[in-house]
């Protein structure tokens, strides 16, 4: 039996108090970070292969169904506001399309050919990377996409919670995050989903840092989409250049990003 389908270590959940349930879930969640830690060498291997491809104009495609697909779309959607990258650089695809973000689409994940068909609509090429996400490691939508991508010489990776899965057989880099049985038997939105989110954070953040989208520890390319972020950017410029608030904010709004504002100011001081 797959680990993700094994019975929970806990039983008679309906007889437990709220406090007991919360403590049980928290106890299980503490296992997730340790499982992710064990997978760091494989995560590193994947990132090290992604970065040179992206420097040549490559993209990352996350592919999943259900919770796994939603998490891929979520991570991809955070890249433009956080790092100021175009939304075409990291793309999340979910079985059933955007409708499936809110509502289950019956049978969508069982279509072995649909995933690759969607990738071809993006004119996928050998500079790109496809990362399959599936706790079970058995999702046909993902497996079919990885298989075809690999045939076309495209880098493939996968994130799964079961060892030696069919999905892993189709990936160049296999990230196995073995978190054990779920608190509610088979509910892989729980520990598996938490671990997937952690790994996706690690992949996208480390890639963006390697691509120069962070300076020091700051999001110097973030989009200025609300007052909070304008103020954060203003503080970054104040700290970096020693300017007062009004001068820093004027520079920021003039140039549109922290990085461009700092670069423009330093250029003006040197010339």
Labelled PLM ranges:
Residues 61, 65-198, 207-211:
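Glycine-rich phosphate-binding loops that contact phosphosugars or nucleotide phosphates
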Residues 41, 45, 140, 194, ...:
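Charged, alpha-helix-enriched surfaces in structured cytosolic catalytic cores
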Residues 207-271:
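Short, amphipathic alpha-helical interaction segments embedded in low-complexity terminal/linker regions
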Residues 38-53:
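A short, well-structured juxtamembrane/interface segment
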Residues 1-35:
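Cofactor-/ligand-binding subdomain signature composed of acidic, glycine-rich
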Residues 58, 154, 243:
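Short glycine/serine/threonine/alanine-rich loop segments
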Residues 28-38, 104, 130-132:
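Short, basic, glycine/proline-bearing loop/turn elements
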